[in-house]
């Protein structure tokens, strides 16, 4: 279980949010909503361990997440708002590099399967710089297939996706949750995935 207690975030001299409490259990996902500037991305960066809260605690499996940050991050996959891909590498090479940075190895067949699931068959050997914004986003999202993680932390994952890709991603998140996974997702749009609850910032 992921538990957040009395979490506060300050940027410069501005308080983005304070006193945030929530929990996400296996088989659940949390939809984080709020206006631009309300702190949605900052909250997800706190959950991913990329920044520190002004106050409060994040707990994972009953222990403070920063007590064993390495073990926590091994079970977490964070995908940010921007499509963080290497423009000079191919779509396939991007997935293999991401796996290598996570300490694993991804075969060409495994990478191809993930890219095909996101409608990128035939584009696997193209340098990413030749892909559209939506296709770059799908290369990033293919990591949801190749990287096994209990907790998905996804910042605006539906950005730049067409209707078909949105449906595909909703299905993938739904499958992950149904299999006992967890997800925390920010999105400006309505999301049709069972097992969800909402947090308004």
Predicted region positions:
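Conserved ABC ATPase "signature" region
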Residues: 108-123
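ABC ATPase C-loop
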Residues: 144-145
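Hydrophobic anchor residue at the start of the ABC signature
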Residues: 141, 180
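Conserved ABC ATPase signature
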Residues: 88, 127-131
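Catalytic Walker B motif of ABC-type/P-loop ATPase nucleotide-binding domains
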Residues: 152-156
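Helix-to-loop junction immediately C-terminal to a conserved catalytic motif
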Residues: 48
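Conserved ABC transporter NBD signature motif
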Residues: 56-67, 71-72
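Q-loop/switch helix immediately C-terminal to the Walker
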Residues: 82, 87-102, 110
């Amino acid at each position: 279980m992921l538990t957040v207690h009395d979490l506060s975030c300050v940027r410069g001299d501005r308080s983005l949010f304070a006193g945030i409490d929530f929990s996400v259990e296996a088989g659940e996902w949390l939809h984080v909503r709020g206006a631009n500037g309300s702190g949605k991305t900052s909250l997800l960066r706190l959950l991913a361990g990329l920044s520190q809260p002004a106050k409060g605690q994040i707990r994972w499996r009953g222990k403070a997440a920063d007590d064993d940050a390495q073990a926590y991050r091994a079970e977490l996959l964070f995908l940010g708002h921007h499509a963080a891909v290497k423009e000079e590498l191919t779509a396939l090479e991007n997935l293999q590099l991401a796996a290598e940075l996570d300490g694993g190895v991804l075969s060409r067949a495994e990478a191809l399967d993930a890219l095909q699931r996101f409608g990128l068959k035939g584009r696997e050997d193209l340098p990413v710089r030749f892909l559209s914004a939506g296709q770059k986003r799908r290369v990033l999202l293919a990591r949801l297939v190749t990287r096994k993680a209990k907790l998905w932390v996804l910042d605006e994952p539906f950005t730049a996706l067409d209707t078909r890709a949105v449906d595909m991603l909703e299905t993938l998140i739904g499958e992950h949750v149904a299999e006992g996974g967890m997800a925390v997702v920010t999105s400006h749009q309505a999301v049709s995935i069972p097992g969800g609850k909402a947090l308004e910032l």
